[in-house]
């Protein structure tokens, strides 16, 4: 929680400071409409690195900063793997990045710090969930979720290979309906989450929804702020876009799973 408090305070300071600095050049105070540059982008994003460092210093806990660094790289890795998985079912990527891209616009070098923040969001949501529900959900449950996901993913993969071997088609390519393919694509995630919801109850369902909603909203707010600040969109969703292409309905289920992805990493790292 302190990470986000520090981030909010630093954000206000940097935003106002930028407006004042620009006013000396333009003789006009402004908080939006700046020209996009990597210096401006990293100026604002650096507040999260500083916030993570302040959190580590405040609680004499170096892991608070190391966790952030791990989340940065884990986020890029997860985003890249997910994008390749998506492309096995769809002709176009689910999103296209517009600056400092790699891998055919499936990710961006500008994404490291935002993914670090995403990891912090996941830990905050999970900690709040544990505090208010007293739930016994721990690392073993998260590992069980991953086991279920891997099993159903492998089943899906085998079905695809069998279909392609005998008919030169796959289950995904046998229909041209985008929504049908999407439902089939997300089955390993949704089935694993549904099974654990039946086993653990509604509280687990609420945790899942919280991950999806918080990530969906925060992604839009971040993208919209950058657009408001500089007039530049850093990404565009290609499927079921909403909010001017900064969000997608199709991203909600992957976002739900992303919360468990980051929390699992955090639990493993902090178990040593």
Task: Name the predicted role of every residue range.
Residues 1-272:
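Aromatic-rich, lipid-facing transmembrane alpha helices and their immediate juxtamembrane interface loops
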């Amino acid at each position: 929680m302190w990470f986000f408090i520090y981030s909010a305070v630093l954000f206000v300071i940097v935003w106002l400071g930028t407006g004042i600095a620009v006013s000396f050049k333009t003789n006009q105070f402004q908080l939006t409409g700046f020209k996009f540059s990597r210096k401006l982008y990293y100026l604002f994003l650096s507040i999260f690195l500083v916030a993570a460092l302040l959190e580590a210093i405040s609680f004499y806990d170096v892991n608070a900063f190391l966790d952030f660094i791990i989340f940065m790289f884990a986020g890029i890795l997860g985003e890249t793997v997910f994008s390749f998985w998506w492309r096995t079912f769809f002709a176009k990527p689910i999103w296209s990045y517009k600056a400092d891209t790699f891998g055919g616009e499936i990710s961006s070098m500008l994404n490291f710090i935002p993914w670090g923040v995403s990891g912090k969001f996941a830990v905050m949501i999970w900690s709040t969930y544990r505090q208010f529900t007293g739930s016994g959900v721990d690392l073993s449950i998260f590992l069980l979720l991953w086991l279920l996901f891997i099993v159903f993913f492998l089943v899906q993969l085998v079905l695809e290979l069998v279909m392609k071997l005998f008919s030169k088609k796959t289950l995904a390519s046998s229909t041209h309906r985008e929504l049908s393919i999407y439902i089939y694509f997300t089955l390993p995630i949704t089935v694993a989450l549904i099974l654990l919801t039946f086993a653990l109850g509604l509280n687990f369902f609420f945790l899942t929804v919280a991950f999806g909603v918080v990530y969906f909203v925060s992604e839009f707010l971040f993208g919209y702020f950058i657009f408001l600040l500089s007039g530049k969109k850093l990404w565009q969703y290609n499927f079921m876009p909403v909010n001017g292409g900064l969000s997608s309905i199709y991203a909600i289920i992957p976002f739900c799973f992303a919360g468990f992805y980051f929390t699992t990493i955090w639990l493993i790292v902090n178990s040593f």
